[in-house]
């Protein structure tokens, strides 16, 4: 089954009891049991809910996993995944990793005895050099947030397996429509379902899947034990969003490429970060391991001090957190999504105060270009 069709018919797409073509919202916290210890598959909605289960089956199907897991947020899912590790374990993280992931690790998980080394994961030599005897996992974002770096998933997974490491991939930017890390050797894939999968800026969710049965059992335990599960209403909204993921991603990518080409030629722009541009250093790798380039891009102005005035002059591009909705969003990572990362560390990774990140929506491309042009005109 091709991906476009799988988005609609994958997982559990219908209700077997009634024939409803949309999975019902099972808005219940508990379930009648036939006898002590005898139930019909569900006993308490933290442990399992039919609406959530349908979503979990769907993400596993889309990513090539054996089991999926739905959480109350992307970070709740990442927390559950990192719970697989033990005190004393060491993890490799990307140097421009999402600020929320950085904060979770460096302010929460360190208290549980975990440690990490920050590296440029798009450079395989840095990964090899950073591996220690107690390194247990390699955590990747590709494309990365916000510099859109591309990491060679197959190569990294091979190195990780040689050293007995788990390869964990945040696939939020690419989505299963454009990239499937499990098929390239990764062990676990995580998503912020809030973003492209939901696609309408109306749900907060996290999804995780794995192609390893033993890992699936452990993640299932932590999902239930920690309890950060996704509710049935949000599970249903996310399933509805996923049905149109293919159409939306094609539109996002078309507009993003148009915007990236416009910015690359603009005299006020210093550099554009978009893997769909031939000038991107990992363009060929992106073409090899992805089926498309998504709708995220970042750029720097020649004058960093103009960045704030520029984004505040935009009208169609909404100044706000998050990404992946049908509407275009703009932000300055240094002051927003990555503000929790120390300034010296941010700048060393290339996240300057003047770096602007765009989540390009599905509006008419000419309207987006005109909005950018009028903002440039306002800053002179």
UniProtKB/Swiss-Prot annotation:
GO terms for biological process: cysteine biosynthetic process via cystathionine; methionine biosynthetic process; transsulfuration. PROSITE patterns: CYS_MET_METAB_PP. Coiled coil: none annotated. GO terms for molecular function: cystathionine gamma-lyase activity; cystathionine gamma-synthase activity; pyridoxal phosphate binding. Binds 1 pyridoxal phosphate per subunit. One of its GO terms (cellular component) is cytoplasm. Its EC number is 2.5.1.48. InterPro entries: Cys/Met-Metab_PyrdxlP-dep_enz, Cys_met_metab_PP, PyrdxlP-dep_Trfase, PyrdxlP-dep_Trfase_major, PyrdxlP-dep_Trfase_small. Disulfide bonds: none annotated. It catalyses: O-succinyl-L-homoserine + L-cysteine = L,L-cystathionine + succinate + H(+). Its cofactor is pyridoxal 5'-phosphate. Keywords: Amino-acid biosynthesis, Cytoplasm, Methionine biosynthesis, Pyridoxal phosphate, Transferase. Pfam families: Cys_Met_Meta_PP. It is found in: Cytoplasm. It is an enzyme of class 2 (transferase). The modification N6-(pyridoxal phosphate)lysine is found at residue 195. Homotetramer. Catalyzes the formation of L-cystathionine from O-succinyl-L-homoserine (OSHS) and L-cysteine, via a gamma-replacement reaction. In the absence of thiol, catalyzes gamma-elimination to form 2-oxobutanoate, succinate and ammonia. Belongs to the trans-sulfuration enzymes family. This is Cystathionine gamma-synthase. The lineage of its organism: Bacteria, Pseudomonadati, Campylobacterota, Epsilonproteobacteria, Campylobacterales. The gene is metB.
């Amino acid at each position: 089954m091709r991906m476009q069709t799988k988005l609609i018919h994958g997982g559990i797409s219908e209700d077997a009891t009634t024939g409803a073509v949309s999975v019902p919202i099972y808005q219940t916290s508990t379930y009648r049991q036939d006898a002590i210890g005898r139930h019909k598959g569900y006993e308490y909605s933290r442990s399992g809910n039919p609406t959530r289960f349908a979503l979990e089956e769907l993400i596993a199907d889309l990513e090539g996993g054996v089991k999926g897991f739905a959480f109350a947020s992307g970070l709740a899912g990442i927390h559950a995944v990192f719970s697989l590790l033990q005190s004393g374990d060491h993890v490799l993280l990307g140097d421009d990793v999402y600020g929320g992931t950085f904060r979770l690790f460096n302010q929460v998980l360190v208290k549980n005895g975990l440690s990490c080394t920050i590296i440029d994961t798009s450079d395989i030599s840095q990964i090899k050099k950073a591996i220690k005897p107690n390194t247990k996992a390699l955590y990747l974002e590709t494309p990365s947030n916000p510099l859109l770096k591309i990491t060679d998933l197959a190569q990294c997974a091979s190195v990780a397996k040689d050293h007995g490491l788990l390869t964990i991939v945040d696939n939020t930017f690419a989505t299963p429509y454009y990239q499937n890390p499990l098929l390239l050797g990764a062990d676990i894939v995580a998503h912020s379902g809030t973003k492209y999968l939901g696609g309408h800026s109306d749900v907060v969710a996290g999804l995780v899947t794995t192609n390893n049965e033993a890992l699936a059992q452990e993640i299932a335990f932590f999902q239930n034990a920690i309890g950060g599960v996704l509710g049935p209403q949000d599970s249903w909204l996310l399933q509805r969003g996923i049905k149109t993921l293919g159409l939306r991603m094609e539109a996002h990518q078309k507009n993003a490429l148009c915007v990236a080409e416009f910015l690359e030629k603009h005299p006020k722009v210093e550099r554009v970060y978009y893997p769909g541009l031939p000038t991107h250093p990992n363009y060929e790798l992106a073409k090899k391991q992805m089926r498309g380039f998504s709708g995220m891009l970042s750029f720097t102005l020649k004058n960093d001090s103009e960045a704030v005035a520029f984004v505040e002059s935009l009208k169609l591009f909404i100044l706000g957190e998050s990404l992946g909705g049908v509407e275009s969003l703009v932000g300055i990572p240094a002051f927003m999504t990555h503000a929790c990362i120390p300034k010296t560390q941010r700048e060393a990774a290339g996240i300057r105060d003047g770096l602007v990140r765009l989540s390009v929506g599905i509006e008419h491309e000419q309207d987006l270009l005109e909005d950018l042009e009028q903002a440039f005109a306002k800053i002179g």
